[in-house]
Amino acid sequence: MASILRSVATTSAVVAAASAIPIAIAFSSSSSSSSTNPKSQSLNFSFLSRSSPRLLGLSRSFVSSPMATALTSDRNLHQEDRAMPQLLTEFMVDMTCEGCVNAVKNKLETIEGIEKVEVDLSNQVVRILGSSPVKAMTQALEQTGRKARLIGQGVPQDFLVSAAVAEFKGPDIFGVVRFAQVSMELARIEANFTGLSPGTHSWCINEYGDLTNGAASTGSLYNPFQDQTGTEPLGDLGTLEADKNGEAFYSGKKEKLKVADLIGRAVVVYKTDDNKSGPGLTAAVIARSAGVGENYKKLCSCDGTVIWEATNSDFVASKV
């Protein structure tokens, strides 16, 4: 069960202007706006599978095409105004008919930051291009009355590791932190926590994923550029703001952060907003998670559980 649930529950990458091109061109114009244009084309996303040799070839051919050149100029103008870069996010949704497809698309297209939505009914997969956080998309899908599981996030490019996740499993603090590689120089970070004390908490990436003594054994702040004076430590993630219910949400981006270098390290949350040298309040190990086109399994190979038979208790008990 562990193999499917980890990749389903914990998958989450951010597109800088230069790397938005392959997604923008490859993404099918299947939203309501494209249906009014008889000349629009719909692309099959089967090439996004990592096992397909077409993946890298298509990305390269799109970038070098005249169409890509035209879109590059247009997207560079608009990308500077966006708070967050775009990502391709995949959900598996329990859909059985075209009515389900329309309900899902119509709901998602009302969310701010979503540019395109494509639904693959045969595989029960919904692909979303946009800058909206996973939390907003998940809530929208739940409001349609259909079961949905996040199965992948990133960009259709040949990164060594495109996505990673850290799960906080209690007993008091629960949460999920998702990292997604947008370009070689940019990563997107999204986090949800419950069970924190109200107020401001500092948080960071520490060197080691050793939880033998909890956060105290995770080492010091991750800072591969420590020889460069005047630069902020790469592992410093700033602060989290927990509301009166102890819930905190974060969505941001980090330059020079490479997701592949984070695997095996730890995310640590601290009690206050100015103490990253203390033992820490809680910690979780950063593990690889599924990127785009990497996780279409509906059946767990370890115990035969179907994805829709999994209960909420099988997943991290946090509002993510």
Swiss-Prot record:
It is found in: Plastid, Chloroplast; Cytoplasm, Cytosol. Cu cation 1 binds at residues 97, 100. Keywords: Chaperone, Chloroplast, Copper, Cytoplasm, Metal-binding, Plastid, Stress response, Transit peptide. CDD domains: HMA. Disruption phenotype: No visible phenotype under normal growth conditions, but mutant plants have increased tolerance to heat stress. One of its GO terms (cellular component) is chloroplast. Induction: By copper and senescence. Down-regulated by heat stress. This is Copper chaperone for superoxide dismutase, chloroplastic/cytosolic. It comes from Arabidopsis thaliana (Mouse-ear cress).
